[in-house]
Amino acid sequence: MDQNNSLPPYAQGLASPQSAMTPGIPIFSPMMPYGTGLTPQPAQSTNSLSILEEQQRQQQQQQAAAQQSTSQPTQAPSGQTPQLFHSQTLTTAPLPGTTPLYPSPMTPMTPITPATPASESSGIVPQLQNIVSTVNLGCKLDLKTIALRARNAEYNPKRFAAVIMRIREPRTTALIFSSGKMVCTGAKSEEQSRLAARKYARVVQKLGFPAKFLDFKIQNMVGSCDVKFPIRLEGLVLTHQQFSSYEPELFPGLIYRMIKPRIVLLIFVSGKVVLTGAKVRGEIYEAFENIYPILKGFRKTT
């Protein structure tokens, strides 16, 4: 039997390697010198090499630019500090799911009393009830002599170390101290307070003291008004607890301390308002215009 016929069909192709190989491709043999059967093949793709070369070139350019920026400081305009390092603007955006510790931008916590818009004028003018002023008579005084010789004067050193003197026009009261200082209270206007202080100084002069009229100054002004509606003081103190205090068992009025102007207001449930602590008349008017819309918001409906 022939040798080729004894092989199975799938092995017959292996017996003739020349017929099984692809034509044009050389068959390598262990005895063949290295490289004799190889033919140089062209590169399959030149695009990949060009892309790599381009990326390397860009990286080199970026490194060179970074070295130049760090070696040379940025030229700043006159009057400003030059930037020595190349840096990016830092952002303080919070991470997702976290709460920032400080709000941006940070707002001041200074308490401010809400002001009244110009279109919401109350139409109410507070009336001055009392003005306290001080004056220096510029000399030492013998209070016993003043109390004995002056009319409408009383002096009790065990109770109060000053002479209490009163006049009818303007209807005021003066506290005269041995140092020469005098306090005048009870006037309804600035002019009346100055006139009353001059009358007291004239009385002291007539008693033989070299009194002068120095450093007259208004220390406090008190005004009052009525808003004509009842006020819910409990709601007001809860909403404005930073400025107000309300203890009905101790005092029936709500004490409201305004920041600007620095005025203290006594607010009563009936709608009466007392303003004190002003140095000039305009501060009382401004404080009432500021508080009026607040009181209007807490008006009792029943």
UniProtKB/Swiss-Prot annotation:
One of its GO terms (molecular function) is DNA binding. Transmembrane segments: none annotated. Sequence repeats lie at residues 128-204, 218-295. The keyword Repeat applies. One of its GO terms (biological process) is transcription by RNA polymerase II. Residues 1-22, 53-122 are annotated as: Disordered. GO terms for cellular component: nucleus; transcription factor TFIID complex. Pfam families: TBP. Gene3D superfamilies: TATA-Binding Protein (3.30.310.10). Residues 57-101, 109-119 have a biased composition (Low complexity). Keywords: DNA-binding, Nucleus, Repeat, Transcription. It is found in: Nucleus. General transcription factor that functions at the core of the DNA-binding multiprotein factor TFIID. Binding of TFIID to the TATA box is the initial transcriptional step of the pre-initiation complex (PIC), playing a role in the activation of eukaryotic genes transcribed by RNA polymerase II. Belongs to the TBP family. Belongs to the TFIID complex together with the TBP-associated factors (TAFs). Binds DNA as monomer. This is TATA-box-binding protein. It comes from Craspedocephalus gramineus. The lineage of its organism: Eukaryota, Metazoa, Chordata, Craniata, Vertebrata. The gene is TBP.
